Every structure is written in C-alpha cells, then in structure tokens.
Amino acid sequence: MLRLVSWNINGIRSPLQGVRCEEPSSCSAMAMGRILDKLDADIVCLQETKVTRDVLTEPLAIIEGYNSYFSFSRNRSGYSGVATFCKDSATPVAAEEGLSGLLSTQNGDVGCYGNMDDFTQEELRALDSEGRALLTQHKICTWEGKEKTLTLINVYCPHADPGKPERLTFKMRFYRLLQIRAEALLAAGSHVIILGDLNTAHRPIDHWDAVNMECFEEDPGRKWMDGLLSNLGCESGSHMGPFIDSYRCFQPKQKGAFTCWSTVSGARHLNYGSRLDYVLGDRTLVIDTFQSSFLLPEVMGSDHCPVGAVLSVSSVPAKQCPPLCTCFLPEFAGTQLKILRFLVHFKQDPVFKQSALQPSNQTQVHMRKNKARVRSTRSRPSKTGSSRGQKNLMSYFQPSSSGPQTSNLDLPSLGTLITPKTSEEDVMANVVEGQTKASEAKDEKEIRTSFWKSLLGGPSPMPLCGGHREPCVMRTVKKPGPNLGRHFYMCARPQGPPTDPSSRCNFFLWSRPS
C-alpha cells in the first residue's frame, strides 16, 4: 500500500512551537519527525511552508528516514512555498521545481512540459517564481506485478483577492499551466496525481455558504475544475475529464467535509468552512488502485486540515535521491567548504612583494626606538618604592612605613578589633524608624496609584451582543475604503449556520471615536 497525505501547514515552523524537547538544537528535527510520524504517510506534501532557502535549517529539512524537496518563493520572504517529504522506501527517481521547466538547471528533472506557446518567458518565470509547484516522479508496482511511473504534482494554487483583479488572472494562468503539464505527463505514459491546496471549493456541497453566494457555479476557478474533472466520481458521466476528485469518488454526498476554516471567526469550532484541498488522480489510476480517500480534521496546527489517499500499489525506491534533494544542498551536504573558494586571485603589486616577515629599514628603526623606550620604562624605579609581591594581610591594618601619610588615624591591630554591641534601645529605635518610613512609602504609593487611576480610567466594558447578552469583541476594519482603521464591536462566538443558536449572532456596533 502507498499512503499519500497533503497538508497546507500555514508556515512549516508554526506547528513546531507546541513540541517540547530537552535539546533546543534538535527540537526542530524532533518536532518535524513527530509531525511526519503522526501523518503516517509514505509521501507527505506540504503547502504554504513560508520559508526561503536562507532561513531553512538542517534540522527542519533533513529528517532521518526521509528525503525532502523544497520549492521557495523567489520574490517575497515568509510567503508561499511547498515541500515534499518521501520515506526512504518511496525515494523518487526524479524531482523538479516549478511547472514551466525554466527552473530546471540540473539532471534528474521530470520533463514532459507540453505546448506552452501561449505563455511568454516572463509570464512563465512569474508563475514559477512564487514557489507553488513541486514534482516528484516515482516507480510503483501494481498488484499484478507491473512496474509503472507515477508523478506527484504538489501544488499551492494562488488565491484570487477580490480587491486585486490581476491576481485572478494570475490564478487562472497558473491553472492553465498546471493542466498543460499534467496532461503532457499523462500523454507520456505516466500516471499523475495532483494534490494540494487548489484554493477553490468546487461544488456547492464543498462550501458552507454556497446558497448565499451569487453566481457560485460561474466562478472561473470552478469552471476550470469542471473541465479538468470527470462528472459523477468514478461513474461515467456527460463529461469525461482526465482527472477524478478522489474524495468525492468515495464520498459523493458527504456534507460538511471541509478542509479550511477562518481562524479569525473561530469557524472551525462549528465546522463552518470550505473544501479547498484535494487529491486528484488520473481516471485509470483512481479506478484501478485507489482504496480510500480521507480528511483528517482532528489534526490541528493550521487553518487547513490534512487530506490523503491510499493506493493498492507498492513503491519501488530509487537507489539514489534526485539532485534536487535538500541533502545535496551545500549547506546540508556535510562537507566543509575550503576558504580558497571565497578568495579572489589577483596579481600582486610590486610595492607589496616584500615579505611580511622581513620589515623594512624604516620599520626596523621604529622597532629599535620602541624597544629602548620599553627598557627605560622598566628600569625606572617605582614612585612608592614598594614591592609588587603579594602583600601581607596585616599590612592593611598597619600604617605605611614609606610614602606620605594620608591620615593620622591609628588603626588597631587585627587582634584588637572589637565589634561594638548594639543596645536594645537602638534596635527598637531602628525598628520604629523603619516602620515609619515603610508606612510613608505605602501612603505615597497609594496616592500615586489613585492619581493615575483617576487620570487613566482604563478601557470601558465591552457592550453586550443582542443575541446572547454576552460581552462582544472589538475588531478593526482592514478593507480599503472610508472606514479603514475604524473599530467596531461584534459577537464573540464562532461563526456558524444562522439557524444554530450557539453560533455568532449578527450584532454590530461602531466604536466611538477616541
């Protein structure tokens, strides 16, 4: 069996913060290893890693028993990015970053790019510059004993921001490039699985509020998925797309099967989300080898939950990892770089040909002068005439025998030192004086505290929502417009169906300007 899991992790370092370990240096490796063990998959595909190569650490990338592959955003730090972790028993024969082929600079690429004539070179580079696609190619053995090729496309598709129309164009062009590459691989004889965050809820059953959304099925992303996927799951339908939504193949009518929830509104508590994460397999592969397709909503740590599938095939591991594997990166390769690689050879100027070990005549003159000064300084007697040896403890209690006297006070010898006794009256006086000072300090502190309390009254209590009569929460308008930056109050409960009394009510109140 081959088990695949895909998860939009929303920052690969975020879920690691809750894992405790005694050795900080190995904490990341232990945490990442525990996450992979918890997912219990032969191949784990992660999206939205939010790391760039300069901040990727060895404990995070090199996990015992796995070989990993990363694609980074080249334009922004802490943005996008995908990664694939393969068990050593599922080592790929090839791996490649990006969909266009422009990022392939070494052997071991997957190949099969298809016809991309309607894309410019600049557009292809832009589509691959955000670290949104990673391909690994594997050898699998079917239950019949036949060896075949399987290509996994780990994708994090763009989100179309309503306020940025150009991002919708970018998203649709990315979809187009993804489909061209996937179909080219199919035409070359490889089985193909597209898995990851597609950032589109395909059917109304895949979105909690589809009935209230205008022109839901007219969305360009949903139309693209209509053309990519076959209708009616595994059964024959009016449209026979090259791929099948594996989850809907096994659970065609399952409601509430969501994979993404809003963290701001707390919608996950009431399962008020959408299904954006998929495992799409080519039609022949799904029908012949898929045993199950599942969601893992109980796995926390991100605003998405993992999804996956189980195939009735076995993996045939490659003898060596592809060149894209992180173990071959110079910073993780385990070989020390020579310092000569960082030095630039240049022709020496004749002025500097003199050896540094042989000083010039002028330098020798200065050195002789400095030596003479040192000798004269050392031979000069001390002003005090005292020796620099270790002093006797008694010398601190006796007057100095040489040098000017700084004081006429005769210090007693060590044996005659006597500690005076403190009378009971003095002790009581000190206690009373201390209590008086403490009382005065307390009174002064109380006066100061009351003054600041009168000056700074603190925040006023939150208003109560109309539906539950519970304290509200304050939010800030972030949408561009006349109300940008204004504060308002709303119900503090999580978002949910309007018919659910435990979900958020529609209370809204503008905050008074300060």
Curated annotation (Swiss-Prot):
Site-annotated residues for Important for catalytic activity: 277
Site (Interaction with DNA substrate): 304
PROSITE patterns named among the record's database cross-references: AP_NUCLEASE_F1_1, AP_NUCLEASE_F1_4, ZF_GRF
Cross-link Glycyl lysine isopeptide (Lys-Gly) (interchain with G-Cter in ubiquitin), where in sequence: 371
Regulation of protein activity: 3'-5' exonuclease activity is activated by sodium and manganese. 3'-5' exonuclease and 3'-phosphodiesterase activities are stimulated in presence of PCNA.
Chain spans, region Required for the interaction and colocalization with PCNA in nuclear foci in presence of oxidative-induced DNA damaging agents: 390-397
Cofactor comment text: Probably binds two magnesium or manganese ions per subunit.
Extent of Basic residues compositional bias: 366-381
One of the GO biological process terms: DNA recombination
Annotated spans, Disordered: 359-417
EC number: 3.1.11.2
PTM info: Ubiquitinated by the CUL9-RBX1 complex. Ubiquitinated by MKRN3 at Lys-371 leading to proteasomal degradation.
Family: Belongs to the DNA repair enzymes AP/ExoA family.
UniProt protein name: DNA-(apurinic or apyrimidinic site) endonuclease 2
